[in-house]
């Protein structure tokens, strides 16, 4: 979507849009296996991967837009992520998607996986991977925030502003409150 946004920005600024940007943006291919699961790359055949690249096509990019395809992709790739060297952000992406699909149990499981193995003493900062001692990993921390704000609370940034989409909370959570959003400092609440 970066090319799409670049084209939109150029138009807003009354700048010419290079034809190649639009051409490439319209012709990006999403590869799939015969069963419809999105393929990591052209020669991918099920081996271990570092992170959830394919699943970023479902959230936050929305190239894979329907929930059924997103779920199939998540179920396929969740056990393909390297458990020792995969970054925390993969599971936060899964958390957002499951929370928005209404699967509170699976969303919470992914939420825990997105930070618990990566916590480092003495301050509880997040390392990049479960085996890394290199804190502070800001992408992982950002993913953790997205899991709560965009996943459990359901907030989505759109061209029209911030919207609250349907989502669910874990069974033992009562509510999530996100305050001070946008220039109007709005408050959003998701209750069980």
Report the location of each language-model feature.
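Non-catalytic C-terminal accessory modules of carbohydrate-active enzymes
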Residues: 105-192
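Active-site core of glycosidic bond-cleaving carbohydrate-active enzymes
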Residues: 4, 8, 12-141
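Conserved active-site neighborhood of enzyme catalytic/cofactor-binding cores
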Residues: 1
